[in-house]
């Protein structure tokens, strides 16, 4: 923590070329939640929770990241607007940059995940149970992309349950920061990158 995500541009289902640092501006902290692909049962479950409880999201902002293209999400939602940004990262550049983990089999399961998959299967969803599954990542981000808090999920459902939980995480982080000594100086880049440019940003290798 204390380091910064470099500046980049991202696409949402309805608007391309958004500035990440512009998203980070303002007095309210930004909570970023990394999810699997948009059509994944876990993603659908938690996005539904966040939409239903969005009115409780006071004093904090939310952005969800999905491993799908903006076009795919736009087609699935028929161009509908979300009340919070959906950052589309089909190649998984942000996931790799931030070290979002994957796990196979029972290592990624929870009782909540079993329930979600059971319901999805009853609705016709098919999946490869042996394939690695993306584990969620929760960040609280401040000005200039400074990472204030990070939690790597230990299971597919180890993430904030709803917007009340998101609000409480942000409040706890801001209260802790206000009570403690000044954190390390933000390290950031003045260059605006695209998502693919993030690969190798920190080690100088931009040929990957």
Regions found by a protein language model. Give the residues of each.
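N-terminal "domain-start" segment that seeds a small globular fold
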Residues: 1-25
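Short loop/turn microsegments at loop-to-beta-strand junctions
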Residues: 5-6, 31, 135-137
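A structure-centric feature marking long, well-folded core domains of fungal metabolic enzymes
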Residues: 9-11, 29-30, 56
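Short active-site neighborhood of thiol/selenol oxidoreductases, capturing the structured segment around
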Residues: 19-52, 61-65
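Structural microenvironment flanking redox-active thiols in thiol-disulfide oxidoreductases
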Residues: 44-97
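Thiol/selenol-based redox catalytic cores and closely related redox-interacting motifs
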Residues: 89-158
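A short, polar/charged loop-to-alpha-helix boundary motif
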Residues: 156-175
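Cysteine/selenocysteine-centered motifs that mediate thiol-based redox chemistry or coordinate metal-sulfur cofactors
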Residues: 175-208
């Amino acid at each position: 923590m204390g380091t910064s995500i470099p500046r980049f541009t991202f696409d949402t289902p309805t608007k391309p070329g958004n500035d990440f640092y512009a998203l980070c501006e303002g007095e309210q902290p930004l909570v970023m939640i990394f999810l699997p692909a948009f059509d994944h049962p876990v993603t659908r479950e938690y996005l539904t929770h966040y939409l239903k409880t969005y009115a409780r999201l006071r004093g904090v902002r939310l952005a969800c990241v999905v491993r799908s293209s903006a076009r795919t999400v736009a087609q699935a939602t028929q161009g509908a607007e979300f009340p919070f940004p959906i950052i589309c990262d089909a190649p998984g550049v942000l996931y790799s940059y931030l070290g979002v983990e994957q796990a196979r089999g029972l290592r990624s399961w929870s009782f909540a995940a079993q329930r979600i998959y059971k319901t999805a299967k009853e609705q016709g969803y098919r999946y490869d149970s042996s394939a690695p599954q993306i584990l969620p990542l929760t960040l609280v981000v401040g000005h200039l992309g400074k990472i204030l808090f990070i939690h790597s999920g230990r299971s597919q459902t180890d993430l904030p349950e709803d917007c009340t939980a998101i609000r409480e995480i942000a409040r706890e982080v801001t209260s802790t920061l206000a009570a403690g000594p000044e954190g390390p100086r933000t390290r950031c880049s003045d260059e605006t990158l695209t998502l693919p440019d993030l690969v190798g940003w920190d080690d100088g290798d931009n040929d990957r």
